[in-house]
A protein has these predicted regions:
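Short glycine-enriched loop/turn motifs at secondary-structure junctions
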Residues: 1-2, 70-75, 105-106
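N-terminal beta-strand motif that seeds the catalytic metal site of vicinal oxygen chelate
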Residues: 1-17, 76-78, 125-130
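Vicinal oxygen chelate
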Residues: 8, 30, 38-41, 80, ...
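Core segments of cupin and vicinal oxygen chelate
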Residues: 8-51
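Helix N-cap motif at beta-to-alpha junctions
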Residues: 12-13, 83-85
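Short amphipathic alpha-helices within nucleic acid-binding modules
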Residues: 19, 86-91
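A short, acidic/glycine-rich surface segment
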Residues: 37-39, 61-67
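Short, charged/polar surface micro-motifs in flexible loops or helix N-caps
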Residues: 46-50, 60-62, 85-87
């Protein structure tokens, strides 16, 4: 068993696709519709066959409440690994991203937090060397 797909709820799939591709630098992997349902995923261009992130339209009341609650408490909806959190912070910030936390050293890692403009906080994580 392995993790091949995970998801984040978004309030607007087109807006999310622009943010995750143009600002974060991911590549669109899948985009198709069946009736009112749209299946939309992105993946790292460095690992085109790696884990995909589904940008799922949040049209569920319970999911919306959860999404809003973790956002308000400063909790990330997803975490992405990077080898260079400070470099990615500068690159992504230059593309217009709003960071709620600049690169910060915490136990065994350096993290930064940004707003994906679609209802989520995203954490960038660079693991420390042990």
């Amino acid at each position: 068993m392995k993790i091949k797909l995970t998801s984040v709820y978004v309030d607007d799939q087109d807006k999310a696709l622009r943010f995750y591709t143009e600002v974060l630098g991911f590549a669109k992997k899948a985009d198709f519709s069946q009736g009112p349902f749209r299946w939309l995923t992105v993946a790292s261009p460095e690992e085109s066959d790696g884990t995909e992130l589904q940008l799922a339209l949040n049209d569920n009341a319970a999911a919306k409440a959860y999404q809003q609650a973790i956002f308000q408490q400063g909790q990330p909806a997803a975490m992405f690994y990077t080898d260079d959190v400070k470099g990615d912070y500068e690159r992504i910030k230059a593309r217009g991203a709003e960071f709620t936390m600049p690169p910060t050293d915490v136990t065994a890692s350096t993290i930064a937090m940004l707003n994906d403009t679609c209802g989520n906080l995203i954490q960038l994580t660079q693991l420390g060397r042990h």
